[in-house]
Every structure is written in structure tokens, then in C-alpha cells.
């Protein structure tokens, strides 16, 4: 692939070929990723959360238990159709189709107290990663965490997972945020941005 962000048509085609092209509902890697992400957020309740890159809604269904309102975004209508079915019985969950960062949801400034971006950034160009970070900073409440989950294995995307995370984090650091949590697991990295006195690294 080139350095350009992947277009919507690619994701629609991928989800037409397979109902779960990333194995988000079956792979041990995915279960481990969900577990660590939710552990990071354990004990917290969120009023307005934003999930970018919700795919078929596996993480959405789990995250919804901690949220009064959850807006889940994906580029592929085929993926969102599955996500809607999966989350049909859950209150407060809304889905939105958009090609990020161009179609970022029209949300009020400082309206989200949690933003999660999972397995999305490396499909974007470096310029689009910076634009997405700017959008997130605008809608983020002052104390809200931004959580990044990125696959770090080989990929033919515009950036690999580590590069994508670094570019997003750099934009946030320039705006005054700090890395409050960073862990590198076997196949993915989990980062959280916010405001604290001391970052937690391992």
C-alpha cells in the first residue's frame, strides 16, 4: 500500500469477503487485547464515550457496560451492520459511519470523557493521524483519557502500529497532554494519554 490513508471501498470489500476479517470475535490476541484495555479502565464510569474503529462491535458491547452513552464509529457499513445486531439490546449505544478524519462526528467541544482508538491509526497517513488527533483534542473533556490500541506486527498499511502511535502521541504532547500509561505486549501496544504528574512506563 502507498502512504495514503486506506479508502472506504477497501474496508467494505474486506468485510464483504469475510464477516470477521480481523478475527476480532475469535482470536486469542483479540481477547487478550480487550481484557487489558478494559482492565485499564476498570472501576470507571463514563458519561459520553467515543470509540473510533469499532469494527463489528465486539469491544463496543463490552465497553458499553461502563458508559451511559457510547458513540461507536467505523468506515464500513458491512461492519456496522454486524455491530448494530451485536449491540441491539444495549442502551445508550449509537453507531456512526464515517471515513476518518474527514467524517469525524460533529460533536460539541469538550463533550467526551473517554476516547478509544483501536486498530485504526495505522490505516491512516501521517497527516491524517495528526488531523484525527486534533479532532480528538477538541472534543475531549479536560480530564478525559484517550486510549490507543495498535497492532505492532508486520503490516502493509501507510504506517506500522508503532509509527502510528508515535505520530498521534506527538500531536497530543504538543497540546499539553502526557502519556499516562504505556505497555508493549507481544503483538500490540496500549497507550493512554491524559494529565498526570508522572507517566507509568514498563
Predicted regions and their residues:
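Class I (Rossmann-like) S-adenosyl-L-methionine-dependent methyltransferase catalytic domain
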Residues: 1-52, 56-108, 124-202
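A conserved beta-strand element that flanks and buttresses the S-adenosyl-L-methionine
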Residues: 116
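Hydrophobic adenine-recognition pocket in adenosine-nucleotide-binding enzymes
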Residues: 120
